[in-house]
Amino acid sequence: MARELILKLGKKITDRVDVKLGMTKLDENSPEYYGLASVVTDEMAELALAMKVRVPTTPAEIGKKVGKDPVYVEQLFDQMSMIGLLEYNWENADHHKQWTLPIFVPGSAELMNMNLQQVETHPEIAQFFERMSFLPLTKITCMVPPGGAGVGMHVIPVEKAIPATNESVDVEHISHWLKKYEGHIGVGYCSCRNAMRIQGEGCGELQDELCIAVGQFADYCRETGKGRDITYEEAMEIIQRAEDNGYVHQITNIDGEDKIFAICNCALGSCFALRTSQLFNTPNMSASAYRAHVDAEKCVACGKCAEVCPAGAAKLGQKLCTKTGPVVYPKQPLPDDNHWGEHMWSPNYKDDNQKQCHESGTAPCKTACPAHIAVQGYINLAAQGRYLDALKLIKQDNPFPAVCGSICNRRCEEACTRGDVDRAVAIDEIKKFVAEQELQADKRYIPKVITHRGIADPYPEKIAIIGAGPASLSCAYYLANMGYENVTVFDKNEVPGGMLTLGIPSFRLEKDVVNAEIEVLREMGVHFQCGVEIGKDLTIDQLREQGYKGFYLAIGAQKSAPIGVPGEELSGVYGGVDFLRRVNLGKKPRIGKKCAVIGGGNVAMDVCRTAIRLGAKDTYIIYRRSQAEMPADAEEVAEAMEEGVQFRFLSAPAEILGENGKVKALKVEIMELGEPDAKGRRKPVGTGKFETIEVTSVIGAIGQRVDLGHIAPEAMAFNRNGTVQADGVTYQTAQPDIFAGGDVVTGPKFAIDAIAAGREGAISLHRYVHEGQSLTLARDPREFYELDKKQAVVPIDCFDAPARQTVAHDASKAKTFSNDRITFTEAQVKAEASRCLGCGVSVVDQNKCIGCGLCTTRCEFDAIHLTRDVPEASRMYRTEDKMKAILPHMVKRAAKLTIKDIKEKCAK
């Protein structure tokens, strides 16, 4: 049965108009009731009912009202303050201590959640806070004028983003507030993040010390154990850390002009204050006086502004005109111009606001790259000679640019709009030039750790990475970059790198390049245990016993697929990746003078060229389709041909012939092409005609398989081809603490695909090892769309650009294990960069923009700025006076909509 005093207290404090007017009656299921009833006694409720909301009072005054001893009242007041029902107040002539009964939000609902032990014991308090930041606002948000009218919180911009020449006012500057309250500044845990964690809906933005208390509220937090004192300098460090993490600064907005009690650093996925504008699509509830604007001439569509924009206002579009004119982008409807209701809300705003690209498309290079590197951006920086900045930009999305500069399959170049004019920009060669700047230890770029807690307080959770290939290394890199100090990479091989080190020959990827980029991980604090086979030397259960909280399985597909013909057991028959591994470990497999390589992919090209370097005089590629169907990179095929490899197209192995247990010859069947298969390639069909080729070795390079070795298969589910089943978004396997990525999940793909998967694995592991975090909520989907190149109009001056630069070769390194490709010169890089058409651009919808300024912190091109478009948004009101601001705006809006309705009716 409901407690009567709690019902009365809930009605007294609530901001719900329907409850205040008696239209809705509270009961046990009302948040006002269950939130208070969980921790407030009837004795406390009796005292609170004798108080006025937001009016300071003393124990003596309340004791007199209720007929209680003031000493007893003060003791209860202290308990009520610890709970979070009351606040302290010293604003009086002699600064004696008073107590205040605050509103629920912002007020006691937050304070009750800041008592961490209390909310763990009573998780219903978290739901109480969430509901009380929602229910009172459902009918009113569309009527609120710019500035918020004293309702809740208000965005305050990144201070560096406010133009120096702008007519800003003091209340728009964070430094103003921190200087005003210097000596009374504190910090505490974020109540929104904590409430969402308790409800299992955290988004990876942890409830660490991020919310700054000022004035007497800071003193209250210290005295009640909800926070601690900090200096002005410490507060500014928190502000900077928040900006690094992409958190929005907000100030309380319920106390009138030039008065606040908190500066919060808010995350879209958790913040109930940001929800007031984002869920209801009513930016006036949050927005500052500023709006972001893009200088399209300077913008290079790196997309970093879109990544950080909490409102989904900044998105990637295209700079190139279409045949019908410039692309016109949609604007978010606003309540001042439209009838509003739930049909205009955005219930999925946490996910929708993560979308970074207009469906009409953006630069094809960024879209095509699996890691969605800011190609247009780093090309622009390289053109300016800002090579370190270019490297920093690349490594935000790809920790191994030097590796990829040597071996990437260049999907960005395949998609390049320039390729429809003449030839694609040599993107990979520019990246390689930029990346090789840091191969020298003294020039190495170590990224700044971006953690919620600060560099001095890293995450202690232990995470095991199984395998040391590109997916594993990428995952480890991003975890270290987040601030994890106990990331350990385990690999059964004696050296890290996986296929980068052992599966790709040095003449394509020099091992010093791989080692230099791995060394960056060591300097970031990643630990390596090589020569340790998980499942054999150490089991996953043993690692769990050692305190490991999460695992990333990325052991690749390092087992050669069998050729599947008689004679495969003969001496001189090798699997392609096994052969390359032995060579990379310094061994020299005996292949004789005549070697046949079965297959038509990149591994086959690596194998045949390696065979030449081991002394084979006659090397054959045996491929069952024609050259047109060959999946290997055309450039690698050409290089193999130049080195003397003989290609036998439309030939399939039938039998390996031997003598005295050794390979003597290869029998092949002549094929012809039939109907296309599911991938569009014509199927090879046997003709029944055979030929025999005299060879001394046969190397099968027809595919790779996953080999889990001694890792217990019962721990996970598998696909028919032996790959591990993992969620397509989170990469979580059937074992909740094991995530997987790279070739072990997809089957053989390219390094850049594995690198992209590693980043997603790190995001999932970060969320998983912290209790109450959703793996999917408010997660960046990394979805980009390519602009319609058929409709794009390229600028006339693009035809005056230089021809594509060509790679030179060092003749002295030909047919050796050294890479004979010569990196572009600086002049070549700048000439090649000038060929970029600059297809993409960022576009800001000012109707959605809340003027936080985070976009400006990410732009390296001076292309996005804030302007003070809505100065009235800096007007501050007391919550008691909110209707003085809302009513005039409501009347004006109603008149505007009436006129609009009449015009629309007349038009019909």
Predicted feature locations:
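Short, amphipathic alpha-helical interaction segments positioned at domain boundaries
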Residues: 95-135, 886
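Flanking helices and flexible, charged tails adjoining ferredoxin-like Fe-S electron-transfer domains
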Residues: 311-364, 379, 425-427, 431-463, ...
